[in-house]
Amino acid sequence: YVFSILLLVKKDALTGLLNRQAYYSETSRAYKDITAIVSIDMNGLKKINDTYGHQAGDEALITLALCFKRSCNVRQSAYRMGGDEFAIVCYKNTEEEVLKLIERINEHVGKTNYTCSIGYCFQKDGRIELDELLKVSDEKMYQNKAEYYKTNQ
């Protein structure tokens, strides 16, 4: 019973992914094993919500979450950080494994009607603070998002 309640607290109700609270809880415990964070932001969610309604936006988020789940291996965990923002934490991955993860994400998302912008930060020695990993990953994702909107207006 207690396990069920803990699981509910750590899961995002809409997508079934782990939530922001789980992200902070789990990453603080396993920090030394984290080699990369991948930041993902859905492109065009506001337009979907405004054009087709929030139910369509929710369906888009659920679809993308499934793409992220399918892309992860056992040493990669997907989280919904809030809104249309997601993160994947990679434990004891090489940079090549992280790039293959991003390739799988792009492949799965490419089969949908949606797009997303992705950035990542990799470290092999555990010297970068977790907040800095996420900050750099987010910055790269926002650079990619700006490029996307520059070419898709």
Feature-to-residue mapping (PLM):
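Short helix/loop segment flanking the catalytic signature motif in cyclic-nucleotide metabolism enzymes
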Residues: A60, A87-I105
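A short pre-motif secondary-structure segment
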Residues: S77-R80
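Residue-level recognition of strand-loop junctions within catalytic nucleotide-signaling folds
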Residues: D50, V89-N93, Q123-K124
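Catalytic-core segments of nucleotide cyclases and related cyclic-nucleotide turnover enzymes
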Residues: L99-N106, G110, F122-Q153
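Regulatory sensory/coupling modules that transmit signals to nucleotide-handling catalytic cores
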Residues: Y1-L6, E107
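Active-site-proximal alpha-helical element of nucleotidyl cyclase-like catalytic domains
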Residues: A56-R75
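Short catalytic/binding micro-motifs of nucleotide second-messenger systems
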Residues: R70-R75, L101-T115
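Conserved nucleotide-binding and Mg2+-coordinating catalytic segments in signaling enzymes
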Residues: I5-S25, I40-H54, I62
